[in-house]
Amino acid sequence: SCKENKKISLECAERSMVLLKNNGILPLDESRIKTIAVIGPNSTSTAALEGNYNGTADRYVTFLEGIQNRFSGRVLYAEGCHLYKDRVSGLAKAGDRYAEAVIAAENADAVVLCVGLDATIEGEEGDTGNEFSSGDKKDLRLPESQRILIKKVMETGKPVIIVCAAGSSVNTECEPDALLHVWYPGSEGGTALAEILFGDISPSG
């Protein structure tokens, strides 16, 4: 992870992210938006940065960290849900993280909702680490836990930017204000995402 390799990693992430929808919310206006809620199971996930067939970096910038590093205002964070299970902890009640996600959204001027997949739930048939759905996907839907999270956050009426990390097509089944498909963007993925959200660079994937 020398300086040169990190620069290449950042450039790859910047050039690969795809802006699928923008109702005018992007780039985010820092003079108007003072609080951002970063919500979702992929917000702090390094697995959502790595993908498959990856090397190991000495430092990963998650989506949450990238936004925190770039944004001078207040950043709220809520995990919202497990990537695909109905609870984050085995001893918790089902859906126990949705309430904090809704509260974070209600107290923000805009929401960055980080959903999608990672290599633990999509991959080749026979992958030993894949306990969700190994091999070809049966459909393009997100896991139910994330579909419920999206619905609850959207119901707050706050502007929502969905950031979908996945190595394949995904149907988010909603109408957000903006939608970014970021693939598995690598160790500098969080930095690249923040640059796009705030207009430092234009998405070109």
Where are these regions (language model features)?
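C-terminal non-catalytic regions of proteins with extracellular/luminal or membrane-system context
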Residues: 3, 7-205
